[in-house]
Amino acid sequence: MTVISVEKMREADRYTIAKGTPSKELMRRAAQGVFDAYPGWDERRVLIACGPGNNGGDGYALAEIMKDAGLDVTLLRVSEKFSEDGEFYYRRCVEKGVPVLTFGTDDVDFSAYPIIVDCMLGTGFTGEPKGPVAAVISEINIARELNGAYVISVDINSGMNGDTGESELAVVSDLTVSIGYYKTGFFEEPAQKLIGALVNVDIGIELPEEQG
């Protein structure tokens, strides 16, 4: 089992892309890995909460995969911003008719979704979540505690520090699907109250020091 820091993960991402793997392909692989990691997708409604960066992009790519599989998936945009790759997959979702809600504009009944996927803040986030993201984190945690929603965090629980496991406010998950490599923060004491099951999916990201 390989465990690396957030900065090492960034370096590995850059290295893999520089060697010729397109970033959109890595995002697609991440989404497919999340889809394959959870065997419980069924006819139940799924809400995917997406933030502004590549973590949100993973959510958009996952929504496309789920739509293609005939599943009942809805996107929740928590930010008006996109990463370049995220916007690419968002547009594909819209073209395929995936329902899209915008937090703060549309009414969102979190209790209506038995499965909620957290794709808001990635491993690069530090500090305390603010604004709509903080509000959605709280709503997800309430839905899990009071309504029994099954919560899946993609790559990391939104709000958690990837190196230390610490958080001011973070999503509590039933399953966290790490992408590429486990991050050091997952195994620190503060993270234990946030993470239920933990799995990692290999999407072909190479560590620079492995090359010689």
Locations of the language-model features?
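YjeF_N-associated NAD(P)HX repair module
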Residues: 1-4, 10, 16, 113-212
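An N-terminal, well-structured beta->alpha segment
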Residues: 1-49
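Nucleotide and nucleotide-moiety/phosphate-recognizing core
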Residues: 35-122, 128-154
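Conserved active-site and cofactor/substrate-binding residues in soluble primary-metabolism enzymes
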Residues: 4-7, 21-33, 57, 84, ...
